[in-house]
């Protein structure tokens, strides 16, 4: 199974990305927020339709720059809004939480780190409680905000601006993979314990993350791909 993660679309198409999807037999696209640039919401359906033309499933969460109504727009476009939710897909379990910790810009999708921590903790704890002893499973946490003090939340001047509310439950539950975004310049792969954390950067810059999962063993590779 092949899963692609993208982030920070900001209302701009990338035709090379659609071409990549059509040429590489991708099963699922995970969208880590900021689909729009403070709107308009009409772009969501336009964007999702382009993805569906590539014969993929799509799950998405909002970013801090997406306006109120974004989850309804995602659903109306025929996609799953994974914000504050979890779902099984093949031999993966994917959990999602959108928005970001506070920024200097007072954007629509901001919330406190305490609230992010409580919400992400509950998602990871819910899966941990359910458990799965019958077959190998890959756990993916999809967030817009990156975990604090990592390669994926670092501004060019070296300041770390990610979310403690994302980082703390990752430490506690160790999901296999965290896909995030938000900090456009921080395209990188890092580790928090056993968790692989990846920020593929803005879609328009021509990168995505590819997760290639063995259907039988659930062994996986995580790579940032240039298209």
Q: What annotation goes with each model-predicted range?
A:
Residues 53, 59, 149, 154-215:
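Conserved beta-sheet core of the metallophosphoesterase superfamily
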Residues 10-16, 36-41, 64-71, 87, ...:
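Active-site environment of divalent metal-dependent phosphoester hydrolases
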Residues 17-20, 46-50, 119, 162-169, ...:
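A general structural detector for well-ordered alpha-helical segments in enzyme core domains, enriched
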Residues 1-4, 86-96, 134-140, 191-196, ...:
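Beta-strand-turn-beta hairpins that frame and shape the catalytic cleft
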Residues 5-8, 29-34, 57-64, 81-83, ...:
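Active-site neighborhood of phospho(di)ester-bond hydrolases with catalytic His/Asp-centered motifs
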Residues 222-227:
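Short, solvent-exposed aromatic-acidic interface loops
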Residues 1-53:
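N-terminal active-site segment of His-dependent metallophosphoesterases
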Residues 66-162:
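Conserved catalytic scaffold of divalent metal-dependent phosphoesterases
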């Amino acid at each position: 199974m092949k899963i692609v993660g993208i982030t920070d679309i900001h209302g701009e198409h990338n035709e090379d990305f659609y071409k990549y999807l059509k040429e590489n037999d991708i099963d699922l696209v995970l969208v880590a927020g900021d689909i729009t640039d403070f709107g308009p919401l009409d772009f969501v359906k336009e964007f999702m339709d382009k993805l569906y033309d590539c014969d993929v499933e799509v799950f998405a969460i909002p970013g801090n720059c997406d306006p109120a109504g974004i989850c309804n727009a995602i659903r109306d476009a025929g996609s799953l809004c994974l914000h504050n939710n979890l779902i099984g897909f093949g031999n993966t379990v994917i959990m999602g939480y959108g928005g970001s910790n506070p920024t200097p810009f007072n954007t629509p999708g901001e919330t406190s780190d305490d609230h992010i921590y409580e919400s992400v903790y509950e998602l990871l704890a819910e899966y941990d409680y359910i458990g799965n002893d019958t077959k190998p499973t890959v756990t993916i946490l999809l967030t817009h905000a990156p975990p604090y003090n990592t390669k994926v939340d670092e501004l060019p001047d070296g300041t770390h601006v990610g979310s403690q509310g994302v980082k703390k439950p990752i430490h506690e539950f160790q999901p296999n993979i965290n896909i995030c975004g938000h900090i456009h310049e921080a395209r990188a792969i890092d580790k928090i314990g056993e968790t692989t954390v990846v920020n593929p950067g803005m879609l328009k810059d021509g990168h995505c993350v590819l997760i290639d999962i063995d259907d039988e063993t659930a062994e996986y590779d995580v790579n940032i791909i240039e298209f």
